[in-house]
Amino acid sequence: MNKLFSTISALAVASVTALYAPASGAQEVKGDPVAGQKKIAMCIGCHGIVGYQASFPEIHKVPKISGQGAKYIVAALNEYKTAARKHPTMRAIAESLSEQDMADVAAYYEAHAREQAGAAPASKPAPAPNARVAELITKGNCISCHGDGFSKPIDPAYPKIAGQHADYLYSALKSYKTENQQYVGRSNGVMAGVAKQFSNAELKALANYIGSIEGDLKVVPE
């Protein structure tokens, strides 16, 4: 059964990767972090405040995006824009951005990781999960996409999740299980297949562990 799920997951990963790959012959938009700094006014009101909480679809801290991979940020914004991720506020913001805007904003937030790397001490090894969480990680094949320490995704369009706010991770994981709702839910075949294997209590245990790992993600006050 695990081998079958791994095969299905691999096929789904390939299809999602193809979805976000530039069309053949199309030129990928290159982001400019300097230009991006001038375009983040709509971002900093939530993502630039330490401890800021959202209340939709439930109370949770807004995700850390400083240090996140640029290609993932662009992919996420496009998902909000097309309503593959349902979130009225984020959809309105994403719809206001051109491809160049998205690339610039993403480049700006990714650059924070490089800036921090020069000044920050070496990251500590990830703490070992307890037996229950280790079993859940293996069952979900989490590292096969998110990489060692949950900070080295195998594809740049996938997120770094180590050190992300645990309550946000929990809310996001549950959203992949949500179907047929107008304003809540995320359409992603890979993550839906993973999340639906677990109870909400198990998803919370995963989120709490992953959120406890030191990673590149930060909240940088603006």
Question: Model regions: which residues?
Answer:
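C-terminal capping alpha-helices of c-type cytochrome domains
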Residues: 95-120, 194-222
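Extracytoplasmic c-type cytochrome modules immediately beyond a signal peptide or single-pass transmembrane anchor
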Residues: 59, 70-118, 123-125
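Inter-heme linker and motif-flanking segments adjacent to c-type heme-binding CXXCH motifs
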Residues: 50-57, 83-86, 111-131, 135, ...
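Residue-level hotspots at or immediately adjacent to binding/recognition sites across diverse folds
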Residues: 27, 49, 93, 148, ...
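Bacterial N-terminal signal peptides that target proteins for export
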Residues: 1-12
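N-terminal signal peptide c-region/cleavage motif recognized by signal peptidases
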Residues: 18-21
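Gly/Gly-Pro-rich "capping" loops immediately C-terminal to redox-active cysteine motifs
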Residues: 33, 51-80, 91-96, 143, ...
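Sequence/structural segment immediately N-terminal to covalent heme-attachment motifs in c-type
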Residues: 28-53, 122-150, 165, 222
